[in-house]
Amino acid sequence: MRSPNSDLDHRHPALAPLLEAGFAPGRLEQVLAFYDEPHRAYHDRVHLREMFDASITLGVPLNATQGLALLFHDAIYVPGAARGTNEMMSAQLLRVYTAGLERSMVDSACSLVIDTAEHIARSQEAELVLDLDLMRLAAAPLDFDRYSRQVFAEQRSLIAIADDTEALAFFSSRRVPFFQQLLDRPWVYCTPAGRKHFEAPARANLRRAIGVKPYAYGNG
């Protein structure tokens, strides 16, 4: 059952440019159903809704291409898939669901989806999409820990360690290189809004995650 806070439909103001570009509300509901799959604990409709909400509250409106990319960026999520595979399949799904829409917009949206695999912006349009995708890194510490446990829950069946505490420690250690890679960048976030609102708390969370081994998750 979805949380009331996960409600996302064609009435959301951030989706208006996408719908005005010809993406049908019925197709929108079909895509959103992918985010309700039972194996998802983090990459779900709540995550998606938060990103669209943030584009409104931060005053950084999405254009149709960016909205399309956000909508599809985690549409396919198979835990344990090789890096980039989920994003590539999500981009392929995007093409299936956008037959008849402007070709250049679809091509650009697919490129943005693929950029989310490495979180490297290869165009200016990608910058806002990537910032919104990484916004949870800047959550309050207890929320950051909760999100980390949600990702762990999605990966748990792939970790051949019976003890949950040991499995969590192993999972945490596997995330360190990615977190360090983000910290080594001059900026974690690309846009002025992302740097203003997310940069400092995200770096604090990432340093904490890397500095404590095994990672001491909060109870919140």
Locations of the language-model features?
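Amphipathic alpha-helical interaction segments
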Residues: L58, V78-A82, L101, I120
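Alpha-helix N-cap and coil->helix boundary residues
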Residues: G26, L62-T65, T85, S104-S108, ...
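Hydrophobic/basic alpha-helical segments enriched in Actinobacteria
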Residues: P17-A24, I56-L58, V96-Y97
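Hydrophobic, proline/glycine-rich low-complexity stretches
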Residues: R2-E29
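Divalent metal-dependent phosphate-bond-processing catalytic cores, especially two-metal-ion Mg2+/Mn2+ enzymes
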Residues: R2-S3, R11-A14, D36-H43, D53-L62, ...
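His-Asp-centered metal-binding catalytic motifs of divalent-metal-dependent phosphohydrolases/nucleases
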Residues: M51, N63-G80, S90, C110-A117
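Short, well-structured alpha-helical segments
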Residues: P25-L32, R45, R49, G67, ...
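An active-site-proximal "capping" alpha-helix that borders the catalytic cofactor pocket
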Residues: M51, T85-G100
